[in-house]
């Protein structure tokens, strides 16, 4: 927020201007800025103004790249090195051109969205989003059995900046969770039937696929068992809260007394500058030309 984003050098953004005015009150001062997305910062020319009092805040002296701590889960960990073929943490929703996956989500969440046209299309959820929700539910089970039953769990859904879209998605996610819990209660014990094949087998297939990809693998714990997990899923699903964060509603709140399992839906306010507790699954379809926004 302290970066002066005005195009003309003699124009200054509000926060940048106020920080400069504070520094002018002292004969000796130093301004140190920290950023996780150092894109615009490195192109600032601190000597652009003729008057030293009007010079920008940084980086007139130096820029230092801090060493990441061992427990930092950042872009290099998520995406891997540049020559990596794929990341174990990312499942692409679509390739560059065409494919089943792209058609899956684009029917509901097109890249270009207009409020009056798009919102009425959200009468269901794409298969990929349902799978992401299922994986989040699996994660809660695994964490509960690893001693984190009192810790929060979160999932992020960011597919639109339209408030009306957030509301439509929230309704469909809530409906999906209710239906999923009912289907597990009704059909989990009916192996070999068409109902089991329709409602339970997709969960089992996802579970097996994730195990093959080293999901929930740890030398300290046994691999989870699907049937044991299945019996606990209805209670886990009923514990999940679907919240939103946007200009009209802010219902993403975590309890200070017990575990909160949160599916957070939002747009710009949720994409950057918002702390989500123990985030384990993100369903992300953001389209932006700004490098820092994309990285955030």
Mark where each language-model region is.
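Conserved P-loop NTPase catalytic core
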Residues: 2-142, 154, 188-197
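Conserved C-terminal RecA-like helicase domain
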Residues: 1-10, 128, 142-263
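Flexible loop/turn segments at secondary-structure boundaries
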Residues: 2-4, 38-43, 49-50, 72-75, ...
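Secondary-structure transition/capping motifs at alpha-helix termini
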Residues: 22-29, 147, 179-184, 276, ...
């Amino acid at each position: 927020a302290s970066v002066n984003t005005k195009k003309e050098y003699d124009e200054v953004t509000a926060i940048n201007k106020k920080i400069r005015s504070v520094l002018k009150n002292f004969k000796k001062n130093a301004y140190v800025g920290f950023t996780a997305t150092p894109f615009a910062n490195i192109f600032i020319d601190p000597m652009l103004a003729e008057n030293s009092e009007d010079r920008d805040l940084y980086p007139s002296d130096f820029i230092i790249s801090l060493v990441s701590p061992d427990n930092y889960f950042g872009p290099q960990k998520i995406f891997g090195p540049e020559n990596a073929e794929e990341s174990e943490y990312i499942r692409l929703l679509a390739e560059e051109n065409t494919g089943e996956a792209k058609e899956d989500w684009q029917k509901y969440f097109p890249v270009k969205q207009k409020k009056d046209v798009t919102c009425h299309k959200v009468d269901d959820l794409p298969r990929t989003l349902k799978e992401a929700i299922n994986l989040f539910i699996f994660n809660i089970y695994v964490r509960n059995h690893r001693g984190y039953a009192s810790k929060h769990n979160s999932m992020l859904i960011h597919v639109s900046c339209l408030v009306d879209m957030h509301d439509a998605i929230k309704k469909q996610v809530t409906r999906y969770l209710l239906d999923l819990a009912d289907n597990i209660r009704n059909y989990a014990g009916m192996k070999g039937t068409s109902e089991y094949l329709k409602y339970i087998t997709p969960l089992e297939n996802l579970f097996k696929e994730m195990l093959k990809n080293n999901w929930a693998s740890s030398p300290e714990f046994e691999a989870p068992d699907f049937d044991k997990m299945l019996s606990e899923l209805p209670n886990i699903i009923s514990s999940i809260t679907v919240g939103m964060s946007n200009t009209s509603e802010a219902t993403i709140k975590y309890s200070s007394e017990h575990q909160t399992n949160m599916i957070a839906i939002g747009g710009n306010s949720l994409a950057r500058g918002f702390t989500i507790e123990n985030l384990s699954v993100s369903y992300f379809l953001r389209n932006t030309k700004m490098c820092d926004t994309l990285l955030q």
